[in-house]
């Protein structure tokens, strides 16, 4: 749905009420096809460089805004592609500061995606 560039610029590719194809074959807490029930937020970067302060600030603002507009969302369910599709995805990767986001949102992240069934369709 969204991309947060390294300078904090926000780019929306897909409206939130539509399905975005960010997760692919994936499973979260026993439920496959994460694209059907999630909002995707990508951060520009690589597995080899830390994310910027601007990205974290924008991410925090986006999450707070989404939770206000969609009361059924919970920060307790925030997780990475690497957790819902670990054999295919590596993002946000080892340089993502989960403790920083956890402290900002007042929850323990990343959410536990549960056991992964590599045969699950998505």
Q: Where are the regions that the model predicts?
A:
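Active-site-adjacent loop/helix surface patches within enzyme catalytic domains
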Residues: 1-72, 76
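Basic/polar, cationic surfaces and motifs that engage anionic cell-wall
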Residues: 32, 47-122
């Amino acid at each position: 749905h969204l991309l947060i560039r390294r300078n904090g610029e926000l780019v929306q590719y897909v409206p939130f009420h539509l399905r975005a194809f960010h997760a692919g074959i994936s499973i979260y807490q026993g439920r496959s096809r994460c694209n059907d029930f999630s909002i995707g937020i990508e951060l520009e970067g690589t597995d080899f460089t830390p994310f910027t302060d601007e990205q974290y600030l924008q991410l925090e603002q986006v999450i707070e805004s989404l939770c206000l507009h969609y009361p059924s969302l919970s920060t307790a369910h925030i997780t990475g592609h690497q957790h819902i599709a670990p054999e295919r995805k590596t993002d946000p990767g080892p340089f993502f500061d989960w403790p920083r986001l956890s402290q900002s949102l007042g929850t323990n992240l990343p959410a536990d995606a549960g056991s992964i069934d590599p045969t699950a369709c998505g």
